[in-house]
Amino acid sequence: MRKITVFGMGSFGTALANVLAQNGHDVLMWGKNVENVDELNTHHMNKNYLKDAKLDSSIKATVDLNKAVQFSDIYLMALPTKAIREVSKDIDQLLTSKKTFIHVAKGIENDTFKRVSEMIEDSISSEHNGGIGVLSGPSHAEEVVIKQPTTVAASSKDNNVSKLIQDLFMNDYLRVYTNNDLVGVELGGALKNIIAIASGIVAGMGWGDNAKAALMTRGLAEISRLGEKLGADPMTFLGLGGIGDLIVTCTSTHSRNYTLGFKLGQGKTAEEALKEMKMVVEGIYTTKSVYHLAQQEGVEMPITNALYEVLFEDVPVSKSVRTLMERDKKAE
C-alpha cells in the first residue's frame, strides 16, 4: 500500500482516486471548494462532476494544501493545464524532500507552448523532483468510476516512473501499458482535443459518417506532423495515447470538447456554449496554443487553423468548412 495525494477534485481526478483506493492505497484529495471537500468526506460522493457515483469510503479530502503536500511522496496532478504551474509552485514552497509527480492534464501552455511535464519540471526545484510521468489514453471518468474496462498508457522519461504508475493503477478493469515516448503521449492527449471540438461541430451540423471519418483521419495526420516535428515517435500516435484517445474523444457525449463542438455546430457561440456547460474545456486553450506553435514550427495544420478562426476570430462555421474543402489539390 502507498500513500497518494490527488491534487484536483474534477471528474477524472475523482475517478482515479477511486481506482487507487480500491487498489488498496491510502488516498487524500486536495481541492479549493469547501462544499466539494465536505461532500466527499461526509457522503463519499462528488456530485458536481460524477453525479451518482458512490466513491470508496476510505478516500479523504482537504482544502489544506500543506496537509495534502505532507501526506505522501506520490502526487497525482489532476488539474486543468492552466492551473498546473501555479499549484506546482505553491507545492514546491512546502516541500522538503523528493516527490514523484503523475499528471493527467491534456493541454499545452498558452504563453510558452510547453507540455504539462515541462511545466511541472519548471516549477519544482530539482532537489524536490523525484520524477514526472503522465497517465493518458481513452478513459472517460464516467466509465472508469463504474469499473467499465479501460486501457491507458503510462509514460515518463524515467522508466521506473512509468512502471510505478502501471503498478499503482492497474487492476482487473483498468489496464495500463508503459510507453517510453513522453513527448508523444502528452501531445497525443492534448492535440486530440482540437479535433474533438471539430468532430462535435460536424455532428452538430448534422453531417454524416463520411465527414466524421475524414475529419478524424486528417486530424490524426495533423497531430502526427506536429508531434514528429517536436520530437515524438510517429508510432505513438497509432497507440492508446494517440488514435485511441482521439476516437473516444471524437465520438462521445462524455467528452466536453465534443459537446462544445456540437453546440457550435448547432449555431451557438463559444461563449454561449461554455456558459451552458460550466466546465473547463481544455481544447479551447489548446487550439490557441497549437495554432501559434504550428506557425512557429512551420507545420501545416488546416483543421486547427479553421477551428482557431471559429473560436477566436468569429468566423462562421460554414465558412471555415468551405475553406477546408476548397483548399488546393494535394496528395494524401
UniProtKB/Swiss-Prot annotation:
Gene3D superfamilies, per database record: N-(1-d-carboxylethyl)-l-norvaline Dehydrogenase, domain 2, NAD(P)-binding Rossmann-like Domain
Full protein name: Glycerol-3-phosphate dehydrogenase [NAD(P)+]
A GO biological process held by the record: phospholipid biosynthetic process
Gene that this sequence comes from: gpsA
Enzyme Commission number, as recorded: 1.1.1.94
UniProt-recorded Gene Ontology molecular function terms: glycerol-3-phosphate dehydrogenase [NAD(P)+] activity; NAD binding
Catalytic reaction list: sn-glycerol 3-phosphate + NAD(+) = dihydroxyacetone phosphate + NADH + H(+); sn-glycerol 3-phosphate + NADP(+) = dihydroxyacetone phosphate + NADPH + H(+)
InterPro entries hit by this protein: 6-PGluconate_DH-like_C_sf, 6PGD_dom2, G3P_DH_NAD-dep, G3P_DH_NAD-dep_C, G3P_DH_NAD-dep_N, NAD(P)-bd_dom_sf
Family under the similarity heading: Belongs to the NAD-dependent glycerol-3-phosphate dehydrogenase family.
Residues that hold sn-glycerol 3-phosphate according to the record: 106, 137, 139, 192, 245, 255-257
Main location class: cytoplasm
Cell compartments where the protein resides: Cytoplasm
Pathway: Membrane lipid metabolism; glycerophospholipid metabolism
Cellular compartments per GO CC: cytosol
Pfam families cross-referenced by the UniProt entry: NAD_Gly3P_dh_C, NAD_Gly3P_dh_N
Residue runs in coiled coils: none
Task of the protein: Catalyzes the reduction of the glycolytic intermediate dihydroxyacetone phosphate (DHAP) to sn-glycerol 3-phosphate (G3P), the key precursor for phospholipid synthesis.
Species of provenance: Staphylococcus epidermidis (strain ATCC 12228 / FDA PCI 1200)
